Swiss-Prot record:
Gene that this polypeptide is encoded by: gcvP
Subunit structure: The glycine cleavage system is composed of four proteins: P, T, L and H.
Protein family: Belongs to the GcvP family.
Name assigned to this protein: Glycine dehydrogenase (decarboxylating)
Pfam families: GcvP2_C, GDC-P
GO cellular component: cytosol; glycine cleavage complex
């Protein structure tokens, strides 16, 4: 039969590109699990009362090329003015070698958080470099591997200051009046739930205030003034007050390290080390503290350890501080950080080295000096005598100056009384400075750059002598070796080769949704129209962003069944926090602020109780029954016991146990009956889209992991996005912003992120995914994710029992394999299986979550039957190896599992094992062999011998 033109146009072509199994493979798998069709399978699994009768109306699919053209037209509505607004955001020059070999390289951006260090040594080394940059520039002893943004880091610094403070009765946190306004906004939001009083005043008046446990100072103030706080910090320390300092990473190249001045905590944004502004993000924050406070620090910390052969190896250290272990007692709810962006910043430092960074910083400062000298020569007054890159210029005709700036397509900072702010950066040129002279002085200013340069070169007093750095930075060889592009390219490739990412194999991590991050989805993030906008530019310059964000929000509203979506949260954990704050403020608006009990099932992700604690709630755990479902009797009892103090329940759906609970609507009804709200964690949204929705189920608020369900890549541990969907009654209580009015959001609440739309520049990824899939493709993606999980479960259940199943013995989009009986019988653990999978070329499934002694597998819809079978065959082969141990063929203390993973050097070393080299390193054959570079990590050694900075190059050889 002749095809129609519509069929030939094939607007749904991308659906087949995104979904791994083709129609024939899908039918084979359906036959294997005993289902006639995808609809029949989901009809068996998903409770009838929550199945959508009609699909969400998000439109028909578009081809990759049509979607890119459509988004390009939207992006073209953004106006790319030259921005001198500053406030913590500047234009950058991202070295092309890093752009091409990291940011645009799936070997870097599709990797997961390095919980399995043996397959993560490359990005762990890059993160260790980031920590070394932080240590050198801040002058402190311990650094983390990034936080979500500078403002979040400030809030974490406040919380940490309280944890370590010896002034246990003090409850006030002092913030210097010249911190960035968005920083103050986020600090105030966090302080409210902790019950802290925030005092804002001139830094020199801090000693006038009593009962202060911590102080936040900014080394280079928001309007540009460099502060020498040495004496003040000394006085504060004598009073046992914890001192945090916000610092500019580029200024720190030239300025005295705050740690050397006595600061306890130093943080800031690493954005200007090569990361585009992107209308607010994503950007990595750096965070450092004194060694004595290391166990109270938030976020991931990379440490140096040893592997089983005694070789140097890297790992995430001190994980007992974190939410996935300590739950509500964790230092922070942080799960996702900003690994990809931290690694861009670290490689920027590697590529430029100390000499290059000093040249960049000195050039920025020289141009600022030239601008200042010219303006002063013509009679304009600078508000501050000491500055690095930012001038606060007093102007009589401010309106006229701003009008001339707009005509020249220039953005100046305009919110300063009787003055304008001008922040220069590494992209600023001589021509830009001359243009600024014209804007501020008129065209006939008569100034000459070279003449001014000679003047300031011999007589620059804009940085106080005491504030000039007198120590060397970045002396480690890694920062002094890779300065040619050839060397840099090879170094980055050597790191990439050490890691296992989606460009090599499936990553079957349960609760993580490691699906395809399609090239077409990634292309727009580097378009200048999206990458180069300042988050605080006038809204009329960001009409393309506003249109794209509004469309994406509308689609998410339809897909979730909610009434509004807030795009601000920078991660899933931050979305949880924002959603719980909305619930808290809603109760307060009804004079029910006493409602502070949050019910959380025993199976919940660790971020849930940690976020509830951060939102000022008490956590009460609800039991699960023998089938892994919420125990309704216990829920009713706990809700009744909480009574008028019940705030909410946090529940994941499908459950963290990998099943669609039949009673989910009843759970919602019980909580609502007692006046509580239902927070439905969106971590497993990939099994809902197009089939059901949180709003239809009965929830009030959810966060959406755009880095899971909606295809933003995990980046090796960030970036992520966690927007929240809410019912209408909660919409007035979502985060707002003190600098930018968020259109369509009538909220009066404080911010949770530095930028109004969080990591706005990665939102085009999710826009592209939804646009190319359409309603039809999105539903099919969910259905195939469910099919793939059930196929794996059905083929593996005889070898590894599936712990929890729902109706008809089915699972949702993931399954939990119970290793405990095998461990009791043979001594082989889930850890041994996880490490042995590396020899077979796979990243391990999620270990011991949500149940200790298990492996949780989530294949996603993007993996083909060929890849699923390869994984299944590997698991079955491992089961056969376990049987060899059980039969006594291999001793428990010396077999391929307990010695896994095996590395290349073992092939030429002496061999005393009872199994062959071939069994050790080529269990799945030689084709596409992945070689780990280290053997199994010694976690105990790493935590007992904590070392979190760069080691000699010889240690890696």
């Amino acid at each position: 039969m002749t095809q129609t033109l519509s069929q030939l146009e094939n607007s749904g072509a991308f659906i087949e590109r995104h979904i791994g199994p083709d129609a024939a493979q899908q039918q084979e798998m359906l036959n294997a699990v005993g289902a006639q069709s995808l609809n029949a399978l989901t009809g068996q699994i998903v409770p009838k009362d929550i199945q959508l009768a009609t699909p969400p109306q998000v439109g028909a699919p578009a081809t990759e090329y049509a979607a890119l053209a459509e988004l390009k037209a939207i992006a073209s509505r953004n106006k790319r003015f030259t921005s001198y607004i500053g406030m913590g955001y500047t234009a950058v020059q991202l070295p092309p070698v890093i752009l091409r070999n990291m940011l645009e390289n799936p070997g870097w951006y599709t990797a997961y958080t390095p919980y399995q260090p043996e397959v993560s040594q490359g990005r762990l080394e890059a993160l260790l470099n980031f920590q070394q940059v932080t240590l050198d520039l801040t002058g402190l002893d311990m650094a983390s591997a990034s936080l979500l943004d500078e403002a979040t880091a400030a809030a974490e610094a406040m919380a940490m200051a309280k944890r370590v403070s010896k002034l246990k009765n003090a409850n006030r946190f002092f913030v210097a009046s010249d911190v960035h306004p968005q920083t103050l906004d986020v600090v105030r939001t966090r302080a409210e739930t902790f019950g802290f009083e925030v005092i804002v005043d001139d830094a020199q008046k801090v000693l006038d205030h009593q009962d202060v446990f911590g102080v936040l100072l900014q080394q280079v103030g928001t309007t540009g003034e460099i502060h020498d706080y040495t004496a003040l910090i000394s006085e504060l320390k004598s009073r046992k007050i914890v001192v945090s300092v916000a610092a500019d990473i580029m200024a720190l190249v030239l300025l005295t390290a705050p740690g050397k001045q006595g600061a306890d905590i130093v943080f800031g944004s690493a954005q200007r080390f090569g990361v585009p502004m992107g209308y607010g993000g994503p950007h990595a924050a750096f965070f450092a503290a004194k060694d004595e406070y290391k166990r109270s620090m938030p976020g991931r910390i990379i440490g140096v350890s040893k592997d089983a052969a005694g070789n140097t190896a890297l790992r995430m250290a001190m994980q007992t501080r974190e939410q996935h272990i300590r739950r509500e007692k964790a230092n922070s709810n942080i799960c996702t950080s900003q690994v990809l962006l931290a690694n861009i910043a670290s490689l920027y430092a590697v590529y430029h080295g100390p000499i290059g960074l000093k040249r960049i910083a000195n050039r920025i400062h020289r141009l600022t000096d030239i601008l200042a000298a010219g303006l002063q020569q013509k009679g304009l007054k600078l508000r501050h005598a000491h500055y690095f890159d930012t001038l606060c210029v007093e102007v009589a005709d401010k309106a006229g100056v701003l009008a001339r700036a707009e005509a020249a397509e220039i953005n100046l900072r305009s919110d300063i009384l009787n003055a304008v702010g001008i922040t220069l950066d590494e992209t600023t040129t001589r021509e830009n400075v001359m243009q600024l002279f014209s804007v501020l002085l008129g065209d006939n200013h008569g100034l000459d750059i070279d003449t001014l340069d000679k003047d300031v070169a011999h007589d620059s007093r804009s940085i106080q002598p005491a504030m000039l750095r007198d120590d060397e930075i970045l002396t480690h060889p890694v920062f002094n070796r890779y300065h040619s592009e050839t060397e840099m390219m090879r170094y980055m490739h050597s790191l990439e080769r050490k890691d296992l990412a989606l460009n090599q194999a499936m990553i079957p991590l349960g609760s993580c949704t490691m699906k395809l991050n399609a090239a077409a989805e990634m292309i727009p993030i580097t378009w200048p129209e999206f990458a180069e906008l300042h988050p605080f530019c006038p809204p009329e310059q960001a009409e393309g962003y506003q249109q794209m964000i509004a469309q994406l929000a509308d689609w998410l509203v339809k897909l979730t069944g909610y009434d509004a979506v807030c795009m601000q949260p920078n991660s899933g954990a931050q979305g949880e926090y924002a959603g719980l704050l909305a619930i808290r403020h809603y109760h307060e608006s009804r004079n029910e602020g006493h409602r502070d009990i949050c019910l959380i099932p025993a199976s919940a992700h660790g971020t849930n109780p940690a976020s509830a604690h951060m939102a000022g709630m008490q956590v009460v755990v609800v039991a699960c029954d023998k089938n892994g479902n919420i125990d309704l009797a216990d829920l009713r009892a706990k809700a009744e016991q909480a009574g008028d103090n019940l705030s909410c329940i946090m529940v994941t759906y499908p459950s963290t146990h990998g099943v669609y609970e039949e009673t989910i609507r009843e759970v919602c009804e019980v909580v609502h009956q007692f006046g509580g709200q239902v927070y439905l964690d969106g971590a497993n949204m990939n099994a809902q889209v197009g089939i059901t929705s949180p709003g239809f189920i009965g929830a009030d608020v959810s966060h959406l992991n755009l880095h899971k369900t909606f295809c933003i890549p995990h980046g090796g541990g960030g970036p992520g996005m966690g927007p929240i969907g809410v019912k209408a009654h909660l919409a007035p209580f979502v985060p707002g912003h003190s600098v930018v009015q968020i259109e369509g959001m009538l909220t009066r609440q404080g911010a949770v992120s530095a930028a109004p739309f969080g990591s706005a520049s990665i939102l085009p990824i999710s826009w592209m995914y939804i646009r190319m899939m359409g309603a039809e493709g999105l539903k099919k993606a969910s259905q195939v994710a469910i099919l793939n999980a059930n196929y794996i479960a059905s083929r593996l259940q005889d070898a590894f029992p599936v712990l929890y199943t729902g109706r008809d013995g089915r699972v949702a989009h993931e399954c939990i394999l119970d290793i405990r009986p095998l461990k009791e019988e043979t001594g082989i653990s889930e850890l041994d299986i996880a490490k042995r999978l590396i020899d077979y070329g796979f990243h391990a499934p999620t270990m011991s979550f949500p149940v200790a002694g298990t492996l949780m597998v989530e294949p996603t819809e993007s993996e083909s039957k060929v890849e699923l079978d390869r994984f299944i065959d590997a698991m079955l082969a491992i089961r056969a190896e376990i049987d060899q141990v059980k039969a006594g063929v291999w001793p428990l203390e010396d077999n391929p599992l307990v010695n896994a993973p095996h590395i290349q050097s073992e092939l030429v070393a002496e061999w005393a094992h009872p199994y062959s080299r071939e069994v050790a390193v080529f269990p799945a054959g030689v084709a596409d062999k992945y070689w780990p570079t280290v053997k199994r990590l010694d976690d105990v050694y790493g935590d007992r011998n904590l070392f979190c900075s760069c080691v000699p190059i010889s240690e890696y050889q």
